[in-house]
Design a protein with these regions (language model features):
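N-terminal glycine-rich anion-binding loops that anchor highly charged ligand groups
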Residues: 9-22, 34, 49-52
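Glycine-rich nucleotide/cofactor/substrate-binding loop typically near the N-terminus or early
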Residues: 42-95
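Short catalytic helix/loop segments, enriched in acidic residues and glycine
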Residues: 24-47
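Active-site glycine-rich loop that binds ribose-phosphate moieties when present
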Residues: 85, 123-148, 156-160
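C-terminal accessory domains and tails appended to enzymatic cores
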Residues: 4-6, 194, 199-279
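Short amphipathic alpha-helices and their capping/turn segments at secondary-structure boundaries
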Residues: 1-8, 85-100
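Active-site rim beta-loop-alpha module in soluble metabolic enzymes
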Residues: 144-206
Length: 279
């Protein structure tokens, strides 16, 4: 590990940011799209990472939310943009990274009073369990980073995702962007306060070493149970290899390799997304 220049992987999402409470706020085609609020928060964090090597992976919706021009202001940032790609939210992670950062993450589906709660697909997935533990996107993706011995070191999101994730990964640095009080409501702190917290957290992260954090992994054999939003979607994904139908809406996969589990989950979301067009 290069102690003088940390290499940081940032997986970017939108729903966990301050200033947004509804789907229109995070939909690029919407007149209510909150790009200004997003960029203020993201730039504050990137400012604190000066001197690091940063890969920023735009992982919300079609992956086209962050303008390429951000790399002019922050020349130490490489931006990954665009839709369907391998490992989607985690594209490009490998053993060379010191830390993973999850920016703008949100609580898992079904979390009480959580702003825009969902897990991978708000329209198709009702719940996900891995080895009996209810999942959110932060935990699912942290385990994928663990395949490459990269720890989740920093989590930026609402209070609910931080509470969920810190129960399992208590050493993770975090910045609470907002207090969620309902599916489409949240309490926002003053912007100046949050921007300062984001920059200071990034500066603190740049002083840390990989050993300060935990590598998250699931013990084998790994079992994922996905509850789909309806029986049609369960019908569709049941055609996938390794998938076992549990009941009307639930399917299950067991495997020793978490990469297989992770890619199967992505395949389910893609199949269900395509089905919205066909049926």
């Amino acid at each position: 590990m290069n102690m003088s220049k940390k290499k940081i992987f940032i997986s970017f999402d939108y729903e966990g940011l301050a200033g947004v409470t509804s789907w229109n706020d995070v939909e690029k085609k919407s007149s209510d799209f909150k790009r200004y609020e997003m960029l203020r928060q993201l730039k504050a964090f990137l400012k604190g990472l000066e001197g690091c090597e940063v890969t920023l992976v735009d992982s919300h919706a079609a992956g086209d939310n962050i303008p390429w021009e951000i790399t002019e202001e922050f020349p130490y940032v490489t931006l990954v943009s665009g839709g369907i790609r391998q490992y989607y939210m985690m594209y490009g992670i490998d053993e060379s990274f010191d830390f993973a950062v999850f920016f703008g993450y949100h609580a898992g589906i079904g979390t009480i009073h959580a702003n825009m709660d969902h897990t991978y697909s708000s329209s198709s997935i009702h719940n996900i369990w891995i080895n009996g533990v209810e999942m959110n996107e932060a935990l699912i993706n942290a385990a994928f980073a663990g395949l490459f011995n990269v720890p989740l070191a920093c989590l930026i999101g609402d209070d609910k995702v931080i509470t969920q994730t810190s129960k399992i990964l208590p050493k993770v640095l975090s910045v609470e962007t907002k207090k969620s009080i309902g599916r489409h409501s949240a309490i926002m702190k003053p912007m100046a306060t949050l921007l300062n917290e984001l920059e200071e957290c990034a500066k603190e992260l740049s002083t840390k070493s990989r050993e300060d954090f935990e590598i998250f992994r699931f013990s084998s054999p790994i079992e994922i149970v996905v509850e789909l939003s309806d029986t049609l979607r369960a019908d569709l994904v049941s055609s996938m290899p390794l998938v076992e139908r549990v009941d009307g809406r639930k399917v299950r996969i067991k495997h020793d390799d978490y990469k297989v589990i992770f890619e199967a989950l992505l395949a389910m979301t893609y199949i269900c997304a395509a089905a919205r067009i066909l049926v």
